Design a protein with these regions (language model features):
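Long, amphipathic, Lys/Arg-enriched alpha-helical "connector/arm" segment
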Residues: 106-114
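N-terminal core-binding DNA-recognition domain of tyrosine recombinases/integrases
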Residues: 5-21, 27-106
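N-terminal positioning helix adjacent to the helix-turn-helix/winged-helix DNA-binding module
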Residues: 1-4, 114
Length: 114
């Protein structure tokens, strides 16, 4: 794990007060993004919005559910918010990326005859 990712993990646990499981999920996602970017000669700190969108498309093609995609996007938002707060970046490449709408089922209605 890189020093930057370790700092982000500490931020999630102490400042953002995320649970260990949530922090672990976010860290795994950021490490996967880091590996993806490395293939293109980029780092987490010089990734563009286009890079993030390409990564998300690649991840969604593996058949992930909307809730998983929402968690992935939330991890990107948290990471780049951390980078802004720490003055590691001057911009947030994830700011225009929206979380997918969640499927909402109507509640079951109780039948008075049953």
């Amino acid at each position: 794990m890189s020093i930057l990712v370790r700092r982000f993990q500490a931020y999630l646990l102490s400042t953002r007060r995320r649970s260990v499981l949530t922090a672990d999920a976010y860290i795994r996602e950021i490490e996967m993004l880091e590996s993806f970017l490395f293939q293109y000669g980029k780092t987490l700190l010089d990734a563009s919005e286009e890079d993030l969108l390409t990564y998300l498309i690649r991840r969604s093609q593996s058949g992930l559910q909307r809730t998983t995609m929402a968690r992935i996007i939330a991890s990107l938002h948290s990471f780049y918010r951390f980078c802004l707060n720490e003055k590691l970046r001057a911009d947030d490449p994830s700011i225009q990326i929206r979380t997918p709408k969640q499927d909402r089922n109507l509640p079951d209605v109780l039948d008075p005859d049953s």
